């Protein structure tokens, strides 16, 4: 998955998707999370497909911190605040002593709430 991770870091999401399809490690929660992230962040996002990959990642690993964070951010894009808050609660349990993913999703939720009247 390293080449795909490098493409994501370079914000070349189309290349990341291509590399992930070649790697075809669909039994890996990390693979599903990276695919979901790349689909969500590409120039023309595909939120419905990204959501399917996040759900698959969480079915494989219910405590996958990256998938919990990124799926929560996707839900905010779909105006599903309650869903994002549920994922934040799951992240809180997955991060025994706090973690970056929890803080990032918490910040995204706060920003989302600040924009709503």
Annotated model-derived regions:
Residues 5, 37-39, 73:
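Residue-level recognition of tetratricopeptide repeat
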Residues 31-33, 67, 101:
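TPR alpha-solenoid repeat register
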Residues 34-35, 70, 104-108:
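Canonical tetratricopeptide repeat
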Residues 85-117:
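Terminal, low-structured helical/coil segments at or just beyond the last alpha-helical repeat
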Residues 9-10, 41-43, 77, 94, ...:
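Register position in tetratricopeptide repeats
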Residues 10-15, 43-56, 78-87:
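Structural signature of tandem alpha-helical TPR/SEL1-like repeats
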Residues 1-23:
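Alpha-helical segment of the N-proximal tetratricopeptide repeat
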Residues 26, 60, 93-97:
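Structural marker of alpha-solenoid helical repeat scaffolds
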């Amino acid at each position: 998955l390293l080449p795909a991770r490098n493409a994501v870091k370079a914000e070349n999401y189309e290349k990341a998707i291509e590399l992930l399809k070649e790697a075809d490690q669909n039994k890996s929660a990390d693979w599903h999370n990276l695919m979901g992230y790349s689909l969500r962040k590409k120039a023309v996002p595909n939120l419905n497909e990204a959501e399917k990959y996040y759900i698959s990642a969480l079915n494989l690993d219910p405590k996958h911190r990256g998938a919990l964070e990124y799926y929560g951010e996707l839900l905010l894009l779909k105006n599903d605040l309650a869903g994002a808050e549920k994922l934040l609660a799951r992240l809180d349990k997955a991060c025994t002593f706090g973690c970056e993913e929890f803080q990032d999703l918490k910040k995204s939720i706060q920003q989302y709430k600040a924009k709503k009247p």
